[in-house]
Amino acid sequence: MAKTLSKPASGALAPWLGISLIVILFDQLSKIAILKTFAYGAQHALTSFFSLVLVYNRGAAFGFLSTASGWQRWAFTALGIGATLVICFLLRRHGQQRLFSLSLALILGGALGNVIDRLVYGHVIDFLDFHVGGWHFPAFNLADSAITIGAVLLVYDELRRVRGSR
């Protein structure tokens, strides 16, 4: 009897794409609300260490390359689309690995949330602003939070896998 290669079930991909879609929806809805509520640079303090503020980020994380001549919009858009393709491939192959796939789904949703901003507005909309004393963390958004949480879970999953193989 001939062996056949089994294809990953497309159903294994659907739940993870659903999580990514939820991240994108919350991210985009929060940005729309901020755009409708705040003027650029306007700040609303919610606590002594946390404010909402509308800022535009033409670069990457922490404003990296934000003062470049404009090429970064398309470079980071292409990077986000490339990451999307790689993540979808990994989700199809490893959809049964729940923590790994959850981390990728969060990263995917965050990456696409920011890609949408770059395509629609030409920059990423940031609005979550933390500051304590003289220390100030650069403003960020829900997409960035999903990417960060996904990356932390990815590292945790890998450490757990390495420890389990010993």
From Swiss-Prot:
<feature type="transmembrane region" description="Helical">
    <location>
        <begin position="71"/>
        <end position="91"/>
    </location>
</feature>
<feature type="active site">
    <location>
        <position position="126"/>
    </location>
</feature>
<feature type="transmembrane region" description="Helical">
    <location>
        <begin position="9"/>
        <end position="29"/>
    </location>
</feature>
<keyword id="KW-0378">Hydrolase</keyword>
<keyword id="KW-0064">Aspartyl protease</keyword>
<keyword id="KW-0812">Transmembrane</keyword>
<dbReference type="Pfam" id="PF01252">
    <property type="entry name" value="Peptidase_A8"/>
</dbReference>
<keyword id="KW-1003">Cell membrane</keyword>
<keyword id="KW-0645">Protease</keyword>
<comment type="pathway">
    <text>Protein modification; lipoprotein biosynthesis (signal peptide cleavage).</text>
</comment>
<keyword id="KW-1133">Transmembrane helix</keyword>
<keyword id="KW-0997">Cell inner membrane</keyword>
<feature type="transmembrane region" description="Helical">
    <location>
        <begin position="100"/>
        <end position="120"/>
    </location>
</feature>
<comment type="similarity">
    <text>Belongs to the peptidase A8 family.</text>
</comment>
<feature type="transmembrane region" description="Helical">
    <location>
        <begin position="135"/>
        <end position="155"/>
    </location>
</feature>
<feature type="transmembrane region" description="Helical">
    <location>
        <begin position="45"/>
        <end position="65"/>
    </location>
</feature>
<dbReference type="GO" id="GO:0005886">
    <property type="term" value="C:plasma membrane"/>
</dbReference>
<feature type="active site">
    <location>
        <position position="144"/>
    </location>
</feature>
<comment type="function">
    <text>This protein specifically catalyzes the removal of signal peptides from prolipoproteins.</text>
</comment>
<dbReference type="InterPro" id="IPR001872">
    <property type="entry name" value="Peptidase_A8"/>
</dbReference>
<keyword id="KW-0472">Membrane</keyword>
<dbReference type="GO" id="GO:0006508">
    <property type="term" value="P:proteolysis"/>
</dbReference>
<dbReference type="GO" id="GO:0004190">
    <property type="term" value="F:aspartic-type endopeptidase activity"/>
</dbReference>
<protein>
    <recommendedName>
        <fullName>Lipoprotein signal peptidase</fullName>
        <ecNumber>3.4.23.36</ecNumber>
    </recommendedName>
</protein>
